[in-house]
Amino acid sequence: MKKYLFAAACVSMFAAAPSYAADETTQSFETGLIPSPHIFLPQGEVKGAVFLISDAAGWGDSEKTEADRLVSQGSVVIGVDFPSYMEALNRYDVSLNDGCIYTVSDIESLSQQVQRAAGNSPYHLPIVAGIGEGGALALAIAAQTPDATIGQTFVVDPHAGIPLSKELCTPAQKKVVGDRSVYGLTDGSLPDPIIATFTPAADKDGRAHVEDLKKAHDAIEIRDSTDDAQTVFADTLDDLVTASGAFDNPLGLPLAVLEAKPNLDTMAVIYSGDGGWRDIDKVVGGMLQKEGIPVVGIDSLRYFWTERKPQETADDLSRIIEFYRKQWKVKHVLLIGYSFGADIVPATYQLLKPEEKRAVAQISLLSLSHQVDYVISVMGWLGQKTEGAGGDPIKDLKGANPKLVQCIYGKDDDDDVACPAVKDVGGEVIELPGDHHFDENYDLLTKTIIDGLKARLKG
């Protein structure tokens, strides 16, 4: 991406008059606890999405100048006024949400709404970024972020902690220093990459806090810069926006590849639910990996963000199967879909190329419904009914070998769960305890899938 050019005499990039002034959109969005965000949409293809959190003084000329610059280069920008947001969070009645505040749902929802309004460009996981107090808030948000939700956390000269008296919903460690709450990060791998850059003007307590975070999470990247905060902020955001559209695999698809030494001569392909590759999809994939089944996970949120045709979906699946069967030297394929991902699997399987179709040893449909969609609906993600324009997966199963089909659902799932109807086409139906997410008993769910696979491989 071409970078914005600065005159050598400029002390700050914000000292120069912007060459492009973006107008805030007049469209309405559900913003949750974020009060009156400043939302800007680019013209043409979306190249990235940035949640730009202001410093302590609030949304002003410097933030608007940076937003203008990002929008001119193709980014969606959602500007957050730090003082008004903190005021809203401190006013929030936490008894409405189990005694704590969860900020990430508003960020995720707003990112999806705004990117959908921007057109049919690929979906970009948002970058959450800020300087000073904005950086401190970005780090606190990272303390409660699930996987595959935020694309990147980027902070410059962050302070230590945030002036919030209410609890954030997170198991991460917390300490109170004066009127500020200082959060650690949750155990395990980072939910998204974190970069913290420090200039000569950085707050020493803020740096000490990030260094403490890095002691527990070595993947955090700490950088030093002799530039001023605004300049290094802009330059780094350019690089991060460019990288946000790249996929780290030869097929150019939004995949999660979990390597394993195969012990069942089988690989798995998992289509995630509409929330993307996280939670149930990621956990089940990891458990299969530990059992010696290498996994390719397809992030349905990103893959189906723009509408796909059924044959296009099947052709991409054929490419995945062909490429990774050769790479892992396996004969069989375990084809799994969860929720939205389960709904598209039957028709996709039917349209596979003959060789790849013959390789499928089991089709595991988890929390199947009666409605197929080949595009993510923001309303569906918010819990509302989708149109099901792609038909009914039960009809798509007709003609498939019923001995391959395993449909698993939770006893307490919605009334419109489709698994019971799979009996009518001769497939195996398994009821497990729990709801749409199987009460998060993923050990039992994975065991059920593997037991079925082993039986089918023998038979």
Model-derived segments and spans:
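Cap/lid segment of the alpha/beta-hydrolase catalytic domain
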Residues: P83-I101, D274-G276, V295, D299-E312
